[in-house]
């Protein structure tokens, strides 16, 4: 489940109509959402609030032997007036990342506040001719998170839209030095420039850590849409991309390439009864996504296949192979949504009306029109209100299993999961005299738990089959 601050950043991207799916970093996002989901390892409580349309806060408290937590603040120059912030009103499908039914990328238009907040006098010209006087200030987002207790870590993010097709991002990570070490806190800065034209997407990166330079690119083959208009008749999309990294200090070189084939909403659209002479769709009646990634330097090859058999059921599988070591990996998973019948509320109060009145913001028809424009680019806008809970299951070739349940309990968003597998049995049987060595295979299995099952027991005791279990609770207002 997305954290509240990630949810607000997603709302910011939708408000400014920046397509996060049109990037090489999101090439395998569908398979990763279904196969690489995180299982909580402890009890964690989050309290979040979108106190004003421009400002959000979040507090986290967790325990795993030691009590730790974090404090987060976020500021956006774009008013998030129509973003649900109460945990009882946020659609669960917007927080849980599952199968992603994407739409054909659309180039940005210049006659809307793509990179700025439109002035009130220009809201009526959303669909009209070009208006260059609606720019008040650039769309900017500031986010900072402080992780406690010491050694504390500070994460900061600066995001700014500088043109219809360009966005800059700067991320900072600073860690406090240990108490006995008298030195300045270590810090690393990552700067990124993203350029998206719909057909092409390029990202240029630089990190102060080892002076790392990077580039990521994605090309949507055969896609030439008009600015501001989506291709509603296109049934599939083929994308090719690559990334490259180089560090002159450490002589580090990285290279990967990939392909993705995915169906678009037109492929699963049911023909109307009036069009009796229409031919059946040659692609498929259900959405699916295929990806192929190759890392030539390490010899790694990976393929994924994800399909949504129904609106409440999705499957995914991944097969990886290394041509140098002859090692292979096979993972399969699925997600099952459950929805209960409920009556549609007449009017929903998000609790921010007092803030709008104080800031002089009127929730008029033009503001609702902007909201409909940004939500029209979301392929899950129709079904995002459906679903009260979801179960995710993941199993690999070593029979390491992850089980996750995410749902709504009253006004709380709850995540509960467990990871288990036979890795601990093999570890203790091979090296019975070293109880701490059993944690290495567990961590290598990717279950996310570093606790050893036999760390405090005698070598002759039978280890536990459990590898990790936890619960996370979120409340937002």
From Swiss-Prot:
A cellular component annotation (GO) from this entry: ERMES complex
Location of this chain's protein in the cell: Mitochondrion outer membrane
Alphabetical keyword list: Membrane, Mitochondrion, Mitochondrion outer membrane, Transmembrane, Transmembrane beta strand
InterPro entries tied to this protein: Mdm10
Region (Disordered): 430-465
Bias-annotated ranges (Low complexity): 430-452
Keyword Mitochondrion: yes
A Gene Ontology biological process term: protein insertion into mitochondrial outer membrane
Pfam families membership: MDM10
Bilayer topology: Multi-pass membrane protein
Similarity section: Belongs to the MDM10 family.
Subunit structure: Component of the ER-mitochondria encounter structure (ERMES) or MDM complex, composed of mmm1, mdm10, mdm12 and mdm34. Associates with the mitochondrial outer membrane sorting assembly machinery SAM(core) complex.
Function: Component of the ERMES/MDM complex, which serves as a molecular tether to connect the endoplasmic reticulum and mitochondria. Components of this complex are involved in the control of mitochondrial shape and protein biogenesis and may function in phospholipid exchange. mdm10 is involved in the late assembly steps of the general translocase of the mitochondrial outer membrane (TOM complex). Functions in the tom40-specific route of the assembly of outer membrane beta-barrel proteins, including the association of tom40 with the receptor tom22 and small TOM proteins.
UniProt comment concerning the protein's domains: Lacks alpha-helical transmembrane segments, suggesting that it resides in the membrane via beta-sheet conformations similar to those predicted for other outer membrane proteins and porin.
Protein name, per record: Mitochondrial distribution and morphology protein 10
Gene this protein is translated from: mdm10
